[in-house]
Protein backbone atom coordinates (compact mmCIF):
# COMPACT_ATOMS: atom_id res chain seq x y z
CA UNK A 1 0.00 0.00 0.00
CA UNK A 2 1.12 3.51 -0.79
CA UNK A 3 -1.82 5.55 0.50
CA UNK A 4 0.19 7.30 3.20
CA UNK A 5 3.19 8.02 1.00
CA UNK A 6 0.96 9.32 -1.78
CA UNK A 7 -0.73 11.67 0.68
CA UNK A 8 2.61 12.86 2.06
CA UNK A 9 3.96 13.36 -1.45
CA UNK A 10 0.93 15.47 -2.39
CA UNK A 11 1.32 17.58 0.76
CA UNK A 12 5.00 18.05 -0.01
CA UNK A 13 4.32 18.96 -3.64
CA UNK A 14 1.76 21.60 -2.61
CA UNK A 15 4.04 23.13 0.03
CA UNK A 16 6.99 23.13 -2.39
CA UNK A 17 4.97 24.87 -5.11
CA UNK A 18 3.79 27.49 -2.61
CA UNK A 19 7.37 28.04 -1.40
CA UNK A 20 8.64 28.56 -4.95
CA UNK A 21 5.84 31.05 -5.63
CA UNK A 22 6.76 33.05 -2.52
CA UNK A 23 10.50 33.00 -3.27
CA UNK A 24 9.84 34.16 -6.83
CA UNK A 25 7.76 37.11 -5.56
CA UNK A 26 10.40 38.42 -3.14
CA UNK A 27 11.93 41.78 -3.98
CA UNK A 28 15.65 42.47 -3.70
CA UNK A 29 14.90 44.43 -0.52
CA UNK A 30 12.93 41.47 0.89
CA UNK A 31 15.83 39.13 0.12
CA UNK A 32 18.08 41.16 2.44
CA UNK A 33 15.66 41.50 5.38
CA UNK A 34 16.64 39.60 8.53
CA UNK A 35 14.19 37.08 9.95
CA UNK A 36 13.38 37.21 13.66
CA UNK A 37 13.28 33.42 14.05
CA UNK A 38 16.53 32.40 12.36
CA UNK A 39 18.31 35.77 12.54
CA UNK A 40 19.47 35.17 8.96
CA UNK A 41 18.54 37.11 5.87
CA UNK A 42 15.47 35.94 3.99
CA UNK A 43 17.81 34.80 1.20
CA UNK A 44 19.95 32.69 3.52
CA UNK A 45 16.84 31.24 5.17
CA UNK A 46 15.44 30.24 1.76
CA UNK A 47 18.83 28.80 0.73
CA UNK A 48 19.06 26.81 3.98
CA UNK A 49 15.60 25.36 3.37
CA UNK A 50 16.47 24.57 -0.24
CA UNK A 51 19.69 22.78 0.64
CA UNK A 52 18.02 20.68 3.29
CA UNK A 53 15.49 19.01 1.00
CA UNK A 54 17.88 16.66 -0.74
CA UNK A 55 19.78 15.96 2.49
CA UNK A 56 16.61 14.93 4.33
CA UNK A 57 15.53 12.78 1.38
CA UNK A 58 18.89 11.00 1.60
CA UNK A 59 18.43 10.32 5.31
CA UNK A 60 14.92 8.96 4.67
CA UNK A 61 16.38 6.66 2.02
CA UNK A 62 18.99 5.48 4.52
CA UNK A 63 16.36 4.73 7.14
CA UNK A 64 14.17 2.67 4.82
CA UNK A 65 17.14 0.74 3.43
CA UNK A 66 18.39 -0.10 6.92
CA UNK A 67 21.70 1.69 6.36
CA UNK A 68 23.79 2.19 9.48
CA UNK A 69 23.51 5.56 11.17
CA UNK A 70 25.88 8.33 10.17
CA UNK A 71 27.83 7.89 13.40
CA UNK A 72 27.92 10.49 16.12
CA UNK A 73 25.70 13.28 14.81
CA UNK A 74 23.91 15.47 17.34
CA UNK A 75 21.39 18.27 17.09
CA UNK A 76 24.10 20.67 18.29
CA UNK A 77 26.29 19.57 15.38
CA UNK A 78 23.42 20.31 12.99
CA UNK A 79 23.03 23.78 14.54
CA UNK A 80 26.76 24.39 13.96
CA UNK A 81 26.48 23.23 10.34
CA UNK A 82 23.49 25.54 9.81
CA UNK A 83 25.38 28.52 11.27
CA UNK A 84 28.35 27.78 9.00
CA UNK A 85 26.01 27.46 6.01
CA UNK A 86 24.53 30.88 6.81
CA UNK A 87 28.02 32.44 6.73
CA UNK A 88 29.10 30.64 3.55
CA UNK A 89 25.93 31.53 1.63
CA UNK A 90 25.37 35.09 2.86
CA UNK A 91 25.55 36.31 -0.75
CA UNK A 92 23.31 33.65 -2.30
CA UNK A 93 21.11 34.73 -5.17
CA UNK A 94 17.43 34.06 -5.72
CA UNK A 95 18.23 32.21 -8.97
CA UNK A 96 20.69 29.79 -7.35
CA UNK A 97 18.35 29.30 -4.39
CA UNK A 98 15.39 28.51 -6.64
CA UNK A 99 17.49 26.06 -8.67
CA UNK A 100 18.65 24.35 -5.47
CA UNK A 101 15.08 24.24 -4.14
CA UNK A 102 13.68 22.75 -7.35
CA UNK A 103 16.42 20.11 -7.52
CA UNK A 104 15.98 19.15 -3.87
CA UNK A 105 12.19 19.17 -4.09
CA UNK A 106 12.22 16.86 -7.12
CA UNK A 107 14.48 14.41 -5.30
CA UNK A 108 12.45 14.54 -2.09
CA UNK A 109 9.15 14.16 -3.95
CA UNK A 110 10.43 11.08 -5.78
CA UNK A 111 11.71 9.51 -2.56
CA UNK A 112 8.49 10.12 -0.63
CA UNK A 113 6.24 9.01 -3.46
CA UNK A 114 8.28 5.84 -3.96
CA UNK A 115 7.82 4.58 -0.41
CA UNK A 116 5.23 2.08 0.73
CA UNK A 117 3.49 2.18 4.09
CA UNK A 118 5.80 -0.48 5.58
CA UNK A 119 8.84 1.60 4.63
CA UNK A 120 7.30 4.70 6.22
CA UNK A 121 7.13 2.76 9.51
CA UNK A 122 10.84 1.82 9.49
CA UNK A 123 12.93 3.69 12.02
CA UNK A 124 16.53 4.68 12.42
CA UNK A 125 18.86 7.01 14.23
CA UNK A 126 18.90 10.53 12.83
CA UNK A 127 20.56 12.24 15.81
CA UNK A 128 22.53 10.34 18.42
CA UNK A 129 21.13 12.60 21.15
CA UNK A 130 17.49 11.94 20.21
CA UNK A 131 15.24 8.87 20.00
CA UNK A 132 15.08 7.01 16.68
CA UNK A 133 12.60 8.35 14.12
CA UNK A 134 10.46 6.59 11.57
CA UNK A 135 10.76 7.58 7.94
CA UNK A 136 7.27 9.08 8.21
CA UNK A 137 8.26 11.18 11.23
CA UNK A 138 11.33 12.47 9.42
CA UNK A 139 9.25 13.37 6.36
CA UNK A 140 6.75 15.19 8.58
CA UNK A 141 9.42 17.09 10.52
CA UNK A 142 12.34 17.39 8.13
CA UNK A 143 10.43 18.09 4.93
CA UNK A 144 6.88 19.29 5.59
CA UNK A 145 7.60 20.91 8.94
CA UNK A 146 10.85 22.44 7.73
CA UNK A 147 9.07 24.15 4.83
CA UNK A 148 6.31 25.40 7.15
CA UNK A 149 8.82 26.70 9.69
CA UNK A 150 11.09 28.62 7.35
CA UNK A 151 8.50 29.80 4.84
CA UNK A 152 6.37 31.01 7.75
CA UNK A 153 9.34 32.98 9.01
CA UNK A 154 10.01 34.42 5.56
CA UNK A 155 6.35 35.40 5.09
CA UNK A 156 6.26 37.07 8.50
CA UNK A 157 9.49 38.96 7.79
CA UNK A 158 8.31 40.36 4.46
CA UNK A 159 4.69 40.92 5.53
CA UNK A 160 2.96 38.29 3.37
Question: What is each model feature region?
Answer:
Residues 5-6, 92-98, 139-140:
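Active-site rim elements
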Residues 1-17:
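Extreme N-terminal tail/first-helix region
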Residues 16-24, 53-57, 61, 102-116, ...:
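Structural signal for well-ordered, non-membrane alpha-helices
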Residues 80-122:
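Acidic/histidine-rich alpha-helical segments that form the ligand environment
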Residues 12-44:
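Long, hydrophobic N-terminal alpha-helical segment
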Residues 21, 35, 87, 110, ...:
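Short, flexible active-site loop motifs that bind/organize anionic cofactors or intermediates
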Residues 32-80, 123-160:
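Short, contiguous alpha-helical
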Residues 25-31, 113-121, 160:
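Surface-exposed helix-capping loop/turn segments at secondary-structure junctions
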